[in-house]
Regions:
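Membrane-embedded alpha-helical bundles that constitute the cytochrome b-like, heme-associated redox core
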Residues: 1-152
Length: 152
């Protein structure tokens, strides 16, 4: 409501928008890989086929998104935490703690993947946990409905 808005909360809204765009970039990479038949979900849906042939431009885009994934991931986590700090943690809406846990979950297992000093088994397990598309879907759904509940 307008009476609760402050200068900090106005900036926090914009930070949340930038975080949303970071998630769009992260999941654009996932979507492109699924469409190209890379990943276990697409192999189950389309055995031995791909929807799109592998054009050079798409490969270049995926290569860029692969190289920058870690940076967009770190930025997304930092922006979400900053957004929460600036807007306030609304624990009365149970969706928000769930979003926070899922975002930190993704960040933690993403960090385990890139940390070279961990044993291979731990890195493989971390990859399997981090690569679950359902976590990203959960973040999106819970964040959306949490914001809907706050706007009422």
């Amino acid at each position: 409501s307008p009476e609760r808005e402050t200068f900090i909360s106005e900036i926090g809204e914009e930070v949340g928008e930038v975080a949303l765009w970071a998630f769009y970039v992260i999941y654009l990479r996932t979507l492109l890989k699924l469409l190209l038949g890379k990943g276990s979900l697409s192999k189950r849906l389309l055995p031995d086929r791909t929807i799109i042939t592998h054009p050079t431009r798409v490969k270049l885009v995926i290569g860029y998104l692969d190289r920058t994934h870690i940076y967009f991931g770190i930025a997304a986590i930092a922006l979400v935490l900053l957004h929460i700090r600036m807007m306030g943690l609304h624990t009365e809406v149970w969706f928000f703690p769930a979003v926070l846990v899922l975002v930190l979950w993704q960040g933690l297992f993403g960090a385990f993947i890139s940390w070279r000093f961990l044993p291979g088994d731990v890195r493989r397990l971390s990859y399997m946990v981090h690569a679950q598309l359902i976590t990203g879907i959960g973040i999106g759904i819970f964040a959306y409905f949490g914001h809907v509940l706050l706007d009422d």
